Design a protein with these regions (language model features):
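Basic, glycine-enriched DNA-binding surface that flanks or lies within the catalytic cores of DNA
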Residues: 1-92
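Acidic, glycine-rich catalytic loops of TOPRIM or P-loop NTPase phosphate-binding modules used
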Residues: 108-170
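Mg2+-dependent endonuclease catalytic cores in nucleic-acid-processing enzymes, primarily RNase H-like
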Residues: 163-183
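Short, solvent-exposed loop/turn segments that connect beta-strands within catalytic domains
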Residues: 57-62, 102-104, 128-132
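Short, basic/hydrophobic alpha-helical segments
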Residues: 88-104, 146-162, 180-184
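Residues at alpha-helix termini
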Residues: 18-19, 123, 184
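Short, well-ordered loop/turn elements at secondary-structure boundaries
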Residues: 46-48, 60, 103-106, 115
């Protein structure tokens, strides 16, 4: 785990955040909401990924999987992104808040396709919007499911929902689906 008081733990995360430009202060803000996960294969190989714990909106104490991101490749090309084996990605989402705000207590919920995107947004906008500290950030880890949408909306009915998906075709489709779900509720 990332410990804001322990430089040695922070160094282990450096290569996962460097290529995204996510600074140490943003890592401090979300330090409770990410970790490293290592998979050991039978052939002796092991792979460590940055992991964003997936939780059920109604039971955030229980981790039901991980959204995983690998280190950037040496040539600067992409890196591994996916979900840990056995993850409940149909209902589970990454849920983070710099202030530790519970989803049921949120006044603002920000929706993203990845934990990286959420942290980047926070870093870019927190100086101009001090309320972001108390906001709740959720990541669907890719394509949002009906179960994810229903779960978050049911737990945060009075919160203002901010849709921050990518602006590509898929992101616009996700936005339309989420808007419909919000209006039905």
């Amino acid at each position: 785990r990332f410990d804001p008081q322990d430089r040695d733990t922070q160094k282990k995360f450096y290569f996962f955040f460097k290529h995204r430009g996510i600074d140490l202060y943003t890592q401090y803000a979300f330090h409770r909401d990410f970790c490293l996960a290592t998979r050991h294969r039978p052939d002796g190989q092991s792979y460590t990924n940055l992991a964003f714990p997936l939780r059920l909106p109604r039971d955030t104490d229980k981790i039901v999987g991980f959204e995983e991101r690998g280190r950037a490749r040496m040539d600067g090309s992409g890196s591994y992104k996916g979900k840990a084996e056995g993850s409940n990605s149909s209902a589970g989402l990454w849920i983070g808040s710099p202030a530790g705000t519970a989803l049921r207590d949120a006044t603002h919920v920000f929706w993203f396709e990845s934990g990286y995107d959420a942290m980047s947004y926070y870093q870019l906008h927190q100086k101009d919007n001090r309320d972001l500290w108390k906001a709740v950030f959720v990541s669907t880890g890719g394509t949002p499911t009906v179960e994810q949408m229903r779960g978050v909306i049911a737990c945060s009915r009075s919160a203002r929902q901010h849709i921050c998906f990518d602006t590509d075709t898929a992101g616009r489709e996700f936005t339309d689906n989420l808007k419909k779900k919000i209006h039905r509720t």
